[in-house]
Amino acid sequence: MLFLALGGPWAAGLRLSGKRTALWASSALRDPRAAVSRAASCRGSSGRVGGTGLSAAAPVLRRVRAQIPVCWERGVRCSHTQLDKSEDGRLIYTGNLARTVFGVKCFSYSTSLISLAFLPYIFAQNNVIFGSLPLQILFYGTIGSFTVITPALLHFLTKGYVIRLYHEARTDTYKAITYSVVLSEKSTVFHQNDVKIPNSTHVFTTFYAKTKSLLVNPALFPNPEDYNHLMGYDKPFTFDLEEASEKKQLKEEK
């Protein structure tokens, strides 16, 4: 009160310092970097008054810097765990042709439905459009191929394409997601011991899960160790010549 009543230079410095401290605190909440640069410029220009404002605003800056990264770190950590882990296990594979397969099958099914919708009209105009029997056979064969054969062939070729693959490490089980006939997601659960590698190379089969053929791309596994464990390549390789010779002798005796 004495300083304010005297109106001396100290009182003016205190009033100016208080105003600048409030400005620094408010700007620090909006943009910490701008507040630091502004405080440094004020300190260089005004000397003692700027230094007082910077020292008063420093705890606010430290508090903002200490709090924001912690919140970001928690948010990133939570989102990371939610994406990687689910009820089916850990996502280890995602097919890059899932949308392509879905789109091609949808187009094939739509053309089949359109052909079936126009069949009554075509049957009604049969005698008018086609006069000869060979033309009728050719026309109906073409419609039949687009209506039945093409969707069936596409489903046969893509029924084993794996959209997503999950792995449960505790039970060492896998869950493969594929497309069904009606384009709904179908799950196949199998153990690692159920995986069988075909003796010869197949275009649309990478391995057999029990009796179901599945197709995956080894290059799309983010972790190559997951693919090696799936195929059983991480197991120790044992080859007993005596057992092989005994089996061969038994076959020859039979």
Swiss-Prot record:
Membrane-side (Mitochondrial matrix) residue stretches: 79-112, 158-254
Residues that span the membrane, as ranges: 113-133, 137-157
Presence of keyword Iron: no
UniProt membrane topology term: Multi-pass membrane protein
GO CC term, one of those recorded: mitochondrial membrane
Database matches in Pfam families: TMEM70 (PF06979)
Source domain of life: Eukaryota
Record carries keyword 4Fe-4S: no
Predominant place of localization: mitochondrion
GO BP terms: mitochondrial proton-transporting ATP synthase complex assembly; protein complex oligomerization
InterPro entries the record matches: TMEM70, TMEM70/TMEM186/TMEM223
Subunit structure as annotated in this protein's UniProt entry: Homooligomer. Interacts (homooligomer form) with ATP5MC1; this interaction facilitates the oligomer formation of subunit c/ATP5MC1 (c-ring) and the c-ring membrane insertion and also protects ATP5MC1 against intramitochondrial proteolysis. Interacts with the core subunits TMEM126B, NDUFAF1, ECSIT and ACAD9 of the MCIA complex. Interacts with ATP5MC3, TMEM242 and TIMMDC1.
Its job: Scaffold protein that participates in the c-ring assembly of mitochondrial ATP synthase (F(1)F(0) ATP synthase or complex V) by facilitating the membrane insertion and oligomer formation of the subunit c/ATP5MC1 through its interaction. Therefore, participates in the early stage of mitochondrial ATP synthase biogenesis and also protects subunit c/ATP5MC1 against intramitochondrial proteolysis. In addition, binds the mitochondrial proton-transporting ATP synthase complexes I and may play a role in the stability of its membrane-bound subassemblies.
Membership in a protein family: Belongs to the TMEM70 family.
Protein's UniProt name: Transmembrane protein 70, mitochondrial
Lineage, broadest ranks: Eukaryota, Metazoa, Chordata, Craniata, Vertebrata
Gene: TMEM70
